[in-house]
Every structure is written in structure tokens, then in C-alpha cells.
């Protein structure tokens, strides 16, 4: 389905940006209400990463920001791009499918077994990142069981002419060129960003090339806006394959698949608008996303060349009613989501490899509402919401053959309460129900007879926590538990996915910040996660009480910032990831993956409008891997080794 943007744009301009007056604009933020507003409260227990924190950190990609500053668990991306697989609350290999990534409130997580295209988001275009752990299904639907990550880009509305250009060179023939431009007047703003990245990466046959461009044109004032945004990226990556246990000792950097590659091109266009009419705010988002990917694999059993085309159109109207009765502030959000997703896969094969001629469609229609109440006198915040969603999935596979279709009617709800306790302390509790729909890769069938499409995954979520905010210091603690039925999981013996018996995810999350002196600041995070099978069997093995693979029980991070001089700053990040089960070890018969600690540093110095920086990743040259898979007899494993010590130099000019 294609939407003609021209008449729609005219309608939005008339509705949202008519009769604009020249005014001084408030700071615009985006919150989990799916509205932009002036200084609206953050969601209960949300973590916010600001643009200044990103600029001062040792992170150079969005994935590194989420891992180093946000405490989000990530693993190596097999194709060598910065699109790190993410996992918020212990889902292991399916962490990506349970963590929803948004840009300006619009979904960019894929309906396939691929990571969200984080590499297409320029760091210098980000205003802030909101990480909300726990279910986000009420507002966003499927795939948000463990939480949402909302990346909010800068608005150029009212911004003076400004920009930046930067160059970074480093190990493995790294070349990274970036540029950004902003200009605006009282009622308009334009932002443009571009990047060109080239690197050979650590492994043989692992070169990665990335070109991105994005921008936004916005018209509006404090009572409304209309914005037309676009992003496009072109990725070309070589695929080295995994290393065996013996090869990790003898040839870590070698390639098992010297001919394999993955190329991908995608575009995203969106038209967004809001208009405030007294106590009501009307909003409408229309977005279109397309992707074309080519992937070649060559093995001893044959080769495959897969060509896939994906397209998704979304429409999201909503209304926010903000009013006050006595000392109670009400924020009632009512909205609808409609999306239409299409997929085509044409795979040619030789030898014993399987060819594939596959297509699929998914149509989602949802209605949701959420009411946020703030009782100012007692310092109490209450959030209550629900969602009803209808999903129609169809999947056609010509070679098996298979024609499958399913309809699902799904519900989600959430109740959250936060209470101010005085002296900077607050406590909160949250309970909710979420769901996830299996994507087309998870529903794929390789050999007849094919089963029906997988059942939706459902989760009952509970969380309690406390926060303290003082002068120059803060601390937070939370405990969560998720009881999941029909968790969607890969089953290696049949090369397919199944619905697991009941699982439980529970954990403790701690975070703290301290301004030690005027020039020294510390931030620390610790997470203990336990993901286990509550009952049932897997491949004929009783797995009751066993650990879910690829979920480290202990993770910790420490960020140190030292303003050595007014123009010189040192940033240090230390990340610890504890032991975890190898992929494919649901019976827990093999030893655990080794724990690892990685230290990254960045020294930055400002000279006028210039910033020069030296960065070193994996400072102590640790040998480690973040992904490994055990063989079928539980006697050995394969893994993807991570980069050892590497460095870069960068120069940035701002005007």
C-alpha cells in the first residue's frame, strides 16, 4: 500500500500549523505518552540519556550509547555493522524481538529476525533517549514485553544556523565521516545529517561499508507543528562466520565463510503533526518504510542467495486531553494504530541447500487508551491503560508447500503507581500484561508437514522500585518478575521455532549517579537477571528449573567523567558481563560462557570550535566473545570473537 503524501501534507499543514504566531518556544521533549509537549513529566521509572551525556561519553554509535550509558545488554552483530542486538530483561537470543526501538515514537524494530537499524541514526541528531524497562505493549503493541527505547531527534524549529563536520580514523582501516546541519526561523526548522563509514573490522572477510542520510523539515510553534522526515541507508557487509573452539586459540581472526556477504538498503519517510486546541491535543503520524536485502552463503553443502523485499505502512491518530480538577492533573490519551506489512523472499540454492519462494503479510489494527493522574497535594502519580489489537497474519511458501493464515485478538493492560515520600525519595509499583506475535522468520517451515503458525507469546509483568534524588546524587532500585507463556524460541533439532512451556524472568536493577567534585562525576549500574524454564521439556530433556541460554546473571557498568581542564575531558567506561549459558544449551549440560570485563576510554580536548579526541576500546586487550553456540552433542562450541584493543582519532568542527 502506498500513501500519497502530497494531499495528506496539505491537510496536516492546515490543521496543525495554521495561524502560526511568532512566539518564544519552550523546550520540546517527547515522552511515552506519544505526544510532544512542553516540559511534560517523564514516564514512571524512565531512564533518560541526554545529548550532553552522549557527547561526553566514550560511545561512538547508538548501540554503544545504549550499552555503556543505558546498561542495555548487547551482543556482537554477526554482519559487522553497529546494529547491536539488544536485550533488556533476559530474553537471550530473542531479546531484539522483545525490546521495541522507536525513533520519535515511531517503530523501527523489524518484523524479522534482524536487529533494528540503529546505525542509520546519527549520534549528533539525538536530543535524548528514553529507556522504559517493563512492558510497553499498551501504547505500542507487540514486541515491547521487556521495554521500549525511544530515540528522540533534535528539532531545528527556531534554531540558528549551525552545524558540524567530523572525521574519525582508526584501527582496521577505519574511516568515519559525519556531517550535520541545522537552520530555522520563528516558525520553521530544517535538519540534515549524513555519514560515510568504512572499516575492515577485526575479522577476515568482515569489511563493512555504511552510508546514511536523514533529515526533517518542520513548521510550527508552541501550539502545534507539522514535520516531514526521511532517512535512508545503504549497508554492505562481508560475513566471516563463527570460529570453532580450536580456532579461537589458533586463528581468532580467520573467516570460516570467505565468500559470504550481506547487503541492505532501506528508506523511511514520515509525516507527523500535532495541534493543541485548548485542553485537547490532536496528533497524527503516517510513515512508510521499505527495505531490500541480498544475502549470500556458501558452505560445503551448497550455496544460497536470498533476496528479500520488505515494506510497512503505518497510520497512528491519537488525542490527548489534559485538564485539572482541583489539585488533580489528568492526562487521558486515546489512540489507534493501523499497519500493513508485506514481505517477499526469493532464495536460489545449489547442492543440498534449500531454495525458498516465500511471501507474507501482516495487518494490525489496534485501539488503546491510557489515563495518567497526578495528585499534586499527596505527590501521587497513577497510570492506567489498556490496548486491544487485532492481527491477521498470512504466510505462503511455494516449495514446501504451505499456505497459512491466522487471526489473533490480543489485549494488554498496565497499572502503575508512584508515590513521593519526601526528602527526595519516591516508590513505585507496576503490573501489566503484554504480548508478542511471531515474525515471519520464526514462522518459517523448512520441511513438510508444516505446523500452524506459532501462538502469540503472553506475559504477566510485575515490578516494584524506589528512587532517591539529591543534590548532585541519585539512586534507583527495582525488582521485576515476568511470567511468560508460549515464549517464542528457536528449536535447533528441527531448524524451526516453537512455543516454549512456561518461563519466568526475574531480576534486580540498581543504578546510581554521584557528582564527586565539580569536575568528576560517576555513574554505575548493576543488574542481576534470572531467566528460567518453570516446567516442561526441550528436545526430550526435562528443563524444569534450567537457565534460558544467553542470559548473563550478573552485569555491571561504571562510567567515570573527569573534567581535567575547562577544555579537556576524560571519559572511562568499564563494563562487566557475567557467565551465561551457550546458545542451544537449554538442557544446561555444557559449561557456561566465560565472563568478561571491557574498559573503554576517550580523551577529548576543545580548541575554539574544534574538538579533538583519542579513544581506545578494550584498553586491556581482553580476549572474549559475547555469543557462542554449543554443538548437538554438548562437547564443543562455536563463537564469534569480539575485537581486541583498538584505537581511533577524531576531529570535529562546529559552527
Range-by-range predicted roles:
Residues 63, 67-106, 110:
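Extracytoplasmic beta-strand/coil segments of soluble accessory domains associated
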Residues 220, 224-233, 262-404, 409, ...:
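Face-selective signature of the C-terminal outer-membrane beta-barrel domain
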Residues 162, 169-198, 203-240, 260-278, ...:
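Transmembrane beta-barrel wall of Gram-negative outer-membrane proteins
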Residues 282-297, 340-342, 420, 426-432, ...:
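Membrane-embedded beta-barrel scaffold of Gram-negative outer-membrane proteins
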Residues 106-133, 453:
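Short acidic/polar hinge/loop motifs at secondary-structure boundaries
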Residues 319-321, 326, 330, 376, ...:
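Gram-negative outer-membrane beta-barrel transporters
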Residues 62-65, 84-89, 99-102, 116-122, ...:
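N-terminal periplasmic accessory domains that precede
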Amino acid at each position: 500500500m502506498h500513501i500519497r503524501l502530497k494531499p495528506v501534507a496539505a491537510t496536516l499543514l492546515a490543521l496543525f500549523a495554521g495561524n502560526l504566531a511568532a512566539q518564544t518556544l519552550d523546550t520540546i521533549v517527547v515522552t511515552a505518552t506519544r505526544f510532544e509537549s512542553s516540559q511534560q513529566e517523564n514516564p514512571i521509572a524512565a531512564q533518560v540519556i541526554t545529548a550532553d551525556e552522549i557527547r561526553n561519553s566514550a560511545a561512538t554509535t547508538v548501540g554503544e550509547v545504549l550499552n555503556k550509558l543505558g546498561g542495555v545488554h548487547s551482543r556482537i552483530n554477526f554482519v559487522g555493522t553497529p546494529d547491536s542486538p539488544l536485550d533488556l530483561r533476559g530474553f537471550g537470543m530473542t531479546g531484539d524481538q522483545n525490546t521495541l526501538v522507536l525513533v520519535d515514537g515511531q517503530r523501527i524494530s523489524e518484523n524479522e529476525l534482524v536487529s533494528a537499524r540503529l546505525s542509520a541514526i546519527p549520534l549528533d541528531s539525538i536530543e535524548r533517549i528514553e529507556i522504559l524497562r517493563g512492558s510497553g505493549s499498551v501504547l505500542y503493541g507487540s514486541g515491547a514485553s521487556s521495554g521500549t527505547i525511544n530515540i528522540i531527534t533534535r528539532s531545528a524549529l527556531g534554531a540558528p544556523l549551525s552545524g558540524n563536520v567530523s572525521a574519525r580514523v582508526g584501527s582496521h582501516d577505519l574511516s568515519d565521516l559525519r556531517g550535520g546541519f541545522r537552520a530555522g526561523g520563528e516558525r520553521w526548522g530544517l535538519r540534515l545529517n549524513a555519514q560515510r563509514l568504512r572499516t575492515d573490522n577485526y575479522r577476515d572477510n568482515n569489511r563493512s561499508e555504511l552510508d546514511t542520510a536523514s533529515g526533517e523539515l518542520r513548521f510550527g510553534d508552541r501550539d502545534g507543528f507539522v514535520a516531514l522526515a526521511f532517512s535512508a541507508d545503504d549497508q554492505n557487509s562481508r560475513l566471516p562466520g563463527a570460529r570453532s573452539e580450536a580456532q579461537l586459540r589458533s586463528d581468532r581472526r580467520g573467516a570460516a565463510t570467505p565468500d559470504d556477504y550481506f547487503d541492505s538498503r532501506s528508506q523511511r519517510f514520515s509525516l507527523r503533526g500535532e495541534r493543541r486546541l485548548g485542553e485537547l491535543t490532536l496528533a497524527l503520524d503516517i510513515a512508510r518504510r521499505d527495505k531490500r536485502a541480498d544475502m549470500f552463503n556458501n558452505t560445503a553443502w551448497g550455496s544460497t542467495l536470498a533476496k528479500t523485499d520488505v515494506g510497512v505502512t503505518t497510520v497512528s491518530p491519537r488525542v490527548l486531553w489534559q485538564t485539572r480538577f482541583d489539585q488533580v492533573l489528568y492526562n487521558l490519551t486515546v489512540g489507534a494504530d493501523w499497519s500493513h506489512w508485506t514481505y517477499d523472499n526469493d532464495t536460489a540454492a545449489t547442492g543440498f541447500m534449500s531454495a525458498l519462494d516465500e511471501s507474507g503479510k501482516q495487518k494490525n489494527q489496534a485501539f488503546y487508551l491510557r489515563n495518567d493522574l497526578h495528585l499534586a497535594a499527596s505527590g501521587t502519580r497513577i497510570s492506567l491503560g489498556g490496548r486491544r489489537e487485532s492481527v491477521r497474519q498470512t504466510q505462503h511458501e511455494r516449495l514446501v508447500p504451505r499456505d497459512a493464515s491466522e487471526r489473533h485478538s490480543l489485549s494488554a493492560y498496565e497499572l502503575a503507581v508512584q508515590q513521593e515520600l519526601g526528602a527526595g525519595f519516591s516508590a513505585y509499583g507496576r503490573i501489566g500484561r503484554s504480548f508478542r506475535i511471531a515474525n515471519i522468520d520464526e514462522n518459517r517451515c523448512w520441511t513438510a508437514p508444516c505446523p500452524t503458525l506459532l501462538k502469540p507469546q503472553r506475559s504477566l509483568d510485575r515490578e516494584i522500585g524506589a528512587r532517591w534524588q539529591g543534590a548532585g546524587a541519585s539512586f534507583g532500585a527495582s525488582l521485576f518478575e515476568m511470567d511468560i507463556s508460549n515464549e517464542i524460541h528457536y528449536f535447533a533439532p528441527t531448524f524451526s521455532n516453537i512455543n516454549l512451556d512456561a518461563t519466568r524472568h526475574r531480576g534486580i536493577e540498581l543504578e546510581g549517579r554521584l557528582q564527586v567534585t565539580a569536575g568528576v562525576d560517576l555513574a554505575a549500574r548493576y543488574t542481576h537477571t534470572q531467566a528460567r524454564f518453570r516446567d516442561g521439556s526441550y528436545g526430550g530433556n526435562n528443563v524444569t528449573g534450567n537457565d534460558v541460554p544467553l542470559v548473563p546473571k550478573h552485569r555491571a557498568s561504571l562510567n567515570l567523567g573527569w573534567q581535567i581542564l575547562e577544555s579537556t575531558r576524560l571519559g572511562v567506561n568499564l563494563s562487566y558481563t557475567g557467565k551465561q549459558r551457550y546458545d542451544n544449551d537449554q538442557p544446561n549440560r555444557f559449561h557456561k560462557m566465560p565472563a568478561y570485563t571491557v574498559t573503554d576510554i576517550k580523551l577529548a580536548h576543545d580548541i575554539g570550535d574544534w574538538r579533538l579526541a583519542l579513544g581506545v576500546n578494550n584498553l586491556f586487550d581482553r580476549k572474549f566473545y559475547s555469543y557462542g553456540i554449543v554443538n548437538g552433542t554438548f562437547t564443543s562450541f562455536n563463537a564469534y570473537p569480539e575485537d581486541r584493543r583498538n584505537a581511533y582519532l577524531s576531529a570535529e568542527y562546529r559552527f
